[in-house]
């Protein structure tokens, strides 16, 4: 089973530079995990996430977006509404660092050259490369085996606004479809575990 990572960006702030074509900002939010271990609630951040982002605004409707985000994924079967998971009792913690690039599309013109207040909903998708701990579960506790990396597809929706000349603030919610089945340690790729 592939995993969905839910990322909620509570706040990201951008400061416009170079004639309002480039944006550089910080990202503060929360993260939660959906997979084989723990609860299955899609939007329930239980750990903080931070990052930086850069946008190159090609037009009032789209921009190229590059970001770095890091956070910790934690989940416990005891927090699940599924009785079989409660009985199993697995838990894990995994550190994740993500590099992402993609296209952000604004549903309304978001022209940073215009001095008027601007607000627009948007969608974002692209490709992410992330580094995580390859873990395994032994005795209902996760253990780090080695560090690994893979790709993911981020998909996000949000709303942003510019209320001051050089300041953009927004909120978004999204998830990542990952190409690994072992963020939670339930499917280790270590040869020592094969029979």
Label each region the model flagged.
Residues 1-26:
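Bacterial Sec-dependent N-terminal signal peptides
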Residues 18-57:
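Short glycine/proline- and aromatic-enriched beta-strand/turn motifs that initiate or cap beta-hairpins
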Residues 20, 44-48, 95-99, 117-119, ...:
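Residues that define the transmembrane beta-barrel architecture of outer-membrane proteins
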Residues 22, 60-64, 166-169:
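Repeated loop/turn-to-beta-strand initiation elements of outer-membrane beta-barrel proteins
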Residues 26, 52-56, 101-105, 125-129, ...:
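Residues on the lipid-exposed face of transmembrane beta-strands in outer-membrane beta-barrel proteins
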Residues 34-40, 84-93, 140-145, 194:
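Extracellular loop and loop/strand-boundary signature of outer-membrane beta-barrel proteins
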Residues 60-62, 66-138:
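Gram-negative (and chloroplast) outer-membrane scaffold detector with strong preference
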Residues 78, 163-195:
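Predominantly the C-terminal beta-signal and adjacent terminal strand-loop region
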């Amino acid at each position: 089973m592939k995993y969905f990572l839910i990322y909620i960006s509570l706040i990201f702030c951008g400061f416009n530079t170079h004639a309002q074509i480039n944006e550089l900002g910080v990202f503060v939010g929360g993260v939660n995990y959906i997979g084989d271990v723990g609860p299955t609630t899609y939007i329930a951040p239980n750990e903080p996430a931070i990052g930086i982002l850069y946008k190159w605004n090609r037009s009032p409707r789209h921009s190229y977006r590059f970001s770095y985000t890091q956070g910790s994924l934690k989940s416990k079967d005891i927090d699940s509404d599924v009785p079989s998971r409660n009985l199993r009792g697995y838990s894990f913690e995994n550190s994740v660092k993500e590099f992402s690039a993609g296209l952000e599309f604004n549903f309304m013109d978001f022209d940073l050259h215009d001095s008027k207040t601007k607000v627009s909903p948007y969608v974002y998708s692209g490709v992410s490369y992330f580094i995580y701990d390859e873990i395994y579960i032994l005795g209902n506790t996760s253990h780090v085996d080695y560090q690994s990396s893979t790709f993911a597809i981020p998909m996000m929706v949000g709303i942003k606004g510019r209320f001051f000349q050089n300041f953009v603030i927004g909120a978004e919610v999204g998830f990542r479809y990952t190409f690994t089945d072992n963020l939670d340690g339930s499917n280790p790729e270590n040869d020592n575990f094969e029979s």
